[in-house]
From Swiss-Prot:
Homotrimer. GO terms for biological process: adhesion receptor-mediated virion attachment to host cell; symbiont entry into host cell; viral tropism switching. It is found in: Virion. This is Tail fiber receptor-binding protein. It comes from Bordetella phage BPP-1. InterPro entries: CTDL_fold, Mtd_2nd, Mtd_N, SUMF_sf. SUPFAM superfamilies: Bacteriophage trimeric proteins domain (SSF141658), C-type lectin-like (SSF56436). The lineage of its organism: Viruses, Duplodnaviria, Heunggongvirae, Uroviricota, Caudoviricetes. Keywords: Host-virus interaction, Late protein, Viral attachment to host adhesion receptor, Viral attachment to host cell, Viral receptor tropism switching, Viral tail fiber protein, Viral tail protein, Virion, Virus entry into host cell. The keyword Thylakoid does not apply. GO terms for cellular component: virus tail, fiber. The C-terminus contains a variable sequence in which nucleotide subtitutions can be introduced at 23 sites by the DGR. Tail fiber protein located at the distal ends of the fibers that binds to the adhesion receptors on the host surface, thereby determining the host range. The phage can alter its tropism by modifying this protein. Variants are expressed through a diversity-generating retroelement (DGR) that creates mutant copies of a template repeat and replaces the end of the tail fiber receptor-binding protein with these sequences, thus changing the host range. Milliards of variants of the fiber receptor-binding protein can be created with this system. The keyword Magnesium does not apply. It comes from the Viruses.
Length: 381
C-alpha cells in the first residue's frame, strides 16, 4: 500500500474566508468535497465528478433570474452563478457585466456564457459571434424594447431599453418552448409583449413591427391543426386564435390575468383613428401614441388598441337551441359569449385594463378583434 496523501480540511464556513496558496487542495468536511485554491479567491473552487457537473447551471438564488438589468442597454450576470461550458466550470464570484452588441429596438437577445470565461449577448439564438454552440452555452435572454415600461398608470416612453421583466434563464423562464417576446407579470405568469401577428408560424406569437392578426387580416392556420404553412384562417374567430395559442404552448388570458398584464396602461383612453395594424407602432390616424398603452411589465398596446380574446365564457347566452357556429366542428347549445378584453382604437373612454366585453360569440370576427398569449411561469431546480 502506498503512503496516504493527506489534505488540510475545514468546515464550509471556514472555507468561505480561506484563500490558501496557489494550487493548494483542501477538503470541505461538511460537504465532503475537494476544493482547489488559487491563492486569491476566498472559498476556492469546489470540485465534483465531471459526470455530475456536466450541463451544470447553478445560481445563488434559485427563485430569481440569474441576471440584473443595470441600465437601458446594460445587464450583468449575478455573483454566485456557476455554468458548465465545454467541459469547464465557469464561476462568477462577483456581478459581471454582459458584453453587449449594438442593440436594436424590438429585438430579442440570447445570453451566452463562453468557455473563455466571458458572458455576452447576441441576437443569434444558436451561438454568439466568434463562438460555436460548443464553446458558448445559451443560458438566458432578454427583450430590448422600443420604449420603457409604465412607471405609473400612464404608459411608458419611447426610449429603447432592456425590459427588466423580460430577463429569463434556463431555470427561470416561460413554460412555453420559445421564451422570446415575453415578459413576467407580477412574478406569476408570462405574457406576450406584442399582439399576435399574422405570420406567427415564422415570427412566433410576439414580435415587434409586424402586421397584427385580426378579423380583417387573420393569422396563418396552425400546422398542428391542419394548416399547410401558408394558408390563413378564414376569419378572426375565438376558435382560431385559441388554436394558434395552443400551437405555441400558450393560452388566451383569463380576466384576472388580463387586468394584471395591462396594469399601468393609460386608462379610459383609446388609440383613436381608423385602425391599429402594426405591433409597437402608432395606429392609422391615431390620436394617442402607442407607448401610452404600455403596461408596468412592458406589455405593448395592452389596451385601447384592439379588443383581445380571453379564455373565459359568460355574459349573454346563446339561443336555447343547437347552433352550428364552430366552423363545421359540431354544434353548441345555449353557448355564452367569449370574453374580450382591453378595448379597441374606437372605444374612446371605454378602454382600459379592466375593460371587458361579454357579448360576442366565439364565432364572431371583426377588424378590431385580436389576441395576445400568456403561459405559466417555470422555476426549475
Amino acid at each position: 500500500m502506498s503512503t496516504a496523501v493527506q489534505f488540510r480540511g475545514g468546515t464550509t464556513a471556514q472555507h468561505a474566508t480561506f484563500t490558501g496558496a496557489a494550487r493548494e487542495i483542501t477538503v470541505d468536511t461538511d460537504k465532503n468535497t475537494v476544493v482547489v485554491h488559487d491563492g486569491a479567491t476566498a472559498g476556492g473552487f469546489p470540485l465534483a465528478r465531471h459526470d455530475l457537473v456536466k450541463t451544470a447551471f447553478i445560481k445563488a438564488d434559485k427563485s430569481a433570474v440569474a441576471f440584473t438589468r443595470t441600465g437601458n442597454a446594460t445587464a450583468s450576470i449575478k455573483a454566485g452563478t456557476i455554468v458548465e461550458v465545454n467541459g469547464k466550470l465557469v464561476q462568477f464570484t462577483a456581478d459581471t457585466a454582459i458584453t453587449m452588441p449594438a442593440l436594436t429596438a424590438g429585438t430579442d437577445y440570447a445570453i451566452y456564457v463562453c468557455d473563455d470565461g466571458t458572458v455576452r449577448a447576441d441576437s443569434n439564438f444558436s451561438a454568439p459571434t466568434g463562438y460555436t454552440s460548443t464553446t458558448a452555452r445559451k443560458v438566458g435572454g432578454f427583450h430590448y424594447a422600443p420604449g420603457s415600461n409604465a412607471a405609473a398608470q400612464a404608459g411608458g416612453n419611447t426610449t429603447a431599453q432592456i425590459n427588466e421583466y423580460s430577463l429569463w434563464d434556463i431555470k427561470f423562464r416561460p413554460a412555453a418552448l420559445d421564451p422570446r417576446g415575453m415578459t413576467l407579470v407580477a412574478g406569476a405568469f408570462w405574457a406576450d409583449i406584442y399582439l399576435l401577428g399574422v405570420n406567427h408560424l415564422t415570427d412566433g406569437t410576439s414580435k415587434y413591427n409586424v402586421t397584427i392578426a385580426d378579423g380583417s387580416a387573420s393569422p396563418k392556420k396552425s400546422t398542428k391543426f391542419g394548416g399547410d404553412g401558408s394558408a390563413a384562417y378564414s376569419d378572426g374567430a375565438w376558435y382560431n386564435f385559441a388554436e394558434v395559442m395552443t400551437h405555441h404552448g400558450k393560452r388566451l388570458p383569463n380576466y384576472n390575468e388580463f387586468q394584471a398584464l395591462a396594469f399601468g396602461t393609460t386608462e379610459a383612453t383609446s388609440s383613436g383613428g381608423t385602425d391599429v395594424p402594426t405591433t409597437g407602432v402608432n395606429g392609422t390616424g391615431a390620436t394617442s401614441a402607442w407607448n401610452i398603452f404600455t403596461s408596468k411589465w412592458g406589455v405593448v398596446q395592452a389596451s385601447g388598441c384592439l379588443w383581445t380574446w380571453g379564455n373565459e365564457f359568460g355574459g349573454v347566452n346563446g339561443a336555447s337551441e343547437y347552433t352550428a357556429n364552430t366552423g363545421g366542428r359540431g354544434s353548441v347549445y345555449a353557448q355564452p359569449a367569449a370574453a374580450l378584453f382591453g378595448g379597441a382604437w374606437n372605444g374612446t373612454s371605454l378602454s382600459g385594463s379592466r375593460a371587458a366585453l361579454w357579448y360576442s360569440g366565439p364565432s364572431f370576427s371583426f377588424a378590431f378583434f385580436g389576441a395576445r398569449g400568456v403561459c405559466d411561469h417555470l422555476i426549475l431546480e
